[in-house]
């Protein structure tokens, strides 16, 4: 495998934070484009100037900052056992580079949202839990396993991002084997009813244990991919199962323990999300405990289902919690389609009301792991643990076009394209800067005018490119 070592000075020096002090009539363009060396590169500044009347002979991106929608929680990725273990196999200099690349808002892409898991998932080197078998009192509860790699990695990420600038949530892949009808953490199975209360208390123990380590878990999903029977850690919850577990056990237990943890349901693909979510949210005794609906991108796009959930339950929130490309194949590391898939999903998800967007593993090794069931996949950064070299996939830059310039607290605003060749979404940050994403999936460059309140700035979107236009 041939890896491209991207030094901090060359890979990240161009990542300059937008200034809230600049003249508000300026538009600064950042670009990542195929068949060029441009990766989140600053590509110049244009002035917004008074526009004559619009014409059908030109293309436009129309932006209206006066129309605001959802507030953004954050954008980021998953801090898994696999990411942490890979991280600590690297030289200290590479560890520092990764932390800066992901979590530094000025010199990196400023990840502000992270997911982790409750005991093991497939991207762990082994299956494990935090208690001894059949300890229903949970007296043996112990997170020592996580203290070796995962907790120090999360703490390092928080320190780089700034604790107040980073939101962390968690998901369980499976209860312990002895709580399930198949007596196995793997291959699906269901939580036995006699352990509903024990499992709810177990989840709260995890939240409290991480809090004691100085890591606040803002929220949790009830079950990762609750309808999937997988060769790795998995557990089946029907919509009715999840509704009753939240209503009778998890919600009351979190409340009883005085935790402010947000509960998210579903945490599976878009295709079935409306049917599953409605079965829970139509029950007021369950819905009162539910902050929102989490979902993934696998199987199909079905963006209309995201919109349907938001329209039907406008008081609830939406969070994208997992997406990745795979299976891992070294010959596909430079395939441009991976980055485009991220940007396409992110634009449609945000435009349909999602408040945060979380990639899967932030870091994997030269095999796309470690993974104890060989379910290897791609991550935005891969590390060769033998040589210490890092490989930045194009997806790192595509996600960075969002995470760096759309900060927590931003609000989505109107952004519409006059051409099918350009996809767009836009946000206004707390500091007043406006960030507009423009995605070109075609083989041809596209000239367009950025139009804001009667003023325009001319731009060009290269073939197979993503732009972030920062109006400041």
PLM region spans:
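A short, flexible beta-alpha/helix-coil linker loop
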Residues: 81-85, 226-229, 326-327
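Short, solvent-exposed turn/loop segments enriched in Gly/Ser/Thr/Pro and often Arg
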Residues: 115-122, 171-175, 221-225, 267-270, ...
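Cleavable N-terminal signal peptides of Sec/SRP-targeted secreted and luminal proteins
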Residues: 2-16
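N-terminal catalytic cores of secreted or lumenal carbohydrate-active enzymes
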Residues: 35, 40-217, 238, 248
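Charged, low-complexity surface segments at secondary-structure and domain boundaries
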Residues: 11, 81-87, 378-388
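Bacterial Sec-dependent signal peptides at the C-terminal "C-region" and cleavage site
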Residues: 16-23
């Amino acid at each position: 495998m041939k890896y491209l070592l991207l030094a901090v000075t060359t890979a990240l020096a161009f990542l300059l934070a937008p200034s809230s002090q600049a003249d508000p009539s300026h538009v600064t363009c950042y670009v990542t484009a195929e068949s060029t060396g441009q990766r989140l590169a600053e590509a110049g500044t244009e002035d917004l100037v008074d526009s004559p009347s619009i014409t059908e002979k030109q293309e436009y991106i129309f932006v209206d900052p006066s129309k605001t929608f959802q507030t953004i929680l954050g954008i980021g990725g998953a801090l898994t056992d696999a990411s942490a273990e890979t991280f600590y196999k690297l030289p200290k200099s590479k560890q520092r580079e990764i932390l800066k690349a992901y979590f530094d808002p000025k010199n990196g892409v400023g990840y502000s949202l992270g997911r982790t898991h409750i005991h093991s998932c497939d991207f762990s080197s082994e299956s494990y839990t935090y208690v001894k078998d059949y300890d229903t009192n949970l007296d043996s509860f112990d997170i020592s396993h996580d203290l070796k790699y995962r907790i120090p990695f999360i703490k390092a990420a928080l320190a780089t991002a700034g604790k107040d600038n980073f939101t962390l949530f968690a998901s369980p892949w499976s209860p312990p084997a002895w709580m399930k009808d198949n007596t196995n953490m793997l291959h699906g199975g269901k939580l036995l009813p006699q352990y509903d209360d024990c499992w709810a208390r177990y989840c709260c123990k995890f939240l409290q244990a991480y809090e004691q380590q100085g890591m606040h878990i803002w929220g949790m999903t009830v079950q990762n991919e609750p309808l999937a029977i997988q060769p790795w850690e998995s557990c089946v919850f029907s919509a009715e199962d999840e509704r009753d577990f939240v209503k009778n056990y998890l919600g009351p237990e979190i409340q009883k323990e005085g935790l402010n943890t947000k509960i998210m349901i579903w945490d599976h693909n878009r295709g079935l999300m409306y049917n599953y979510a409605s079965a829970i949210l139509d029950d007021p005794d369950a819905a009162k405990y539910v902050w929102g609906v989490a979902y993934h991108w696998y199987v199909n796009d079905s963006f209309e289902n995201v919109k349907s959930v938001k329209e039907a339950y406008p008081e609830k929130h939406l969070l994208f919690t997992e997406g990745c490309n795979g299976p891992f194949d070294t010959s596909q590391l430079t395939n441009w389609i991976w980055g485009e898939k991220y940007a396409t999903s992110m634009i449609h998800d945000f435009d349909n009301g999602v408040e945060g967007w979380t990639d899967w593993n932030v870091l994997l090794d030269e095999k796309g792991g470690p993974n104890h069931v060989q379910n290897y996949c791609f991550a935005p950064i891969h590390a060769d643990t033998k040589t210490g070299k890092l490989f930045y996939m194009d997806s790192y830059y595509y996600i960075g076009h969002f995470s760096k310039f759309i900060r927590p607290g931003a609000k989505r605003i109107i952004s519409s394209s006059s051409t099918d060749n350009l996809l767009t979404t836009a946000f206004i940050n707390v500091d007043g800067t406006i960030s507009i994403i423009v995605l070109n999936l075609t083989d041809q460059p596209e000239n367009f005018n950025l139009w804001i309140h009667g003023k325009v700035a001319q731009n060009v979107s290269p073939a197979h490119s993503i732009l972030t236009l920062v109006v400041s």
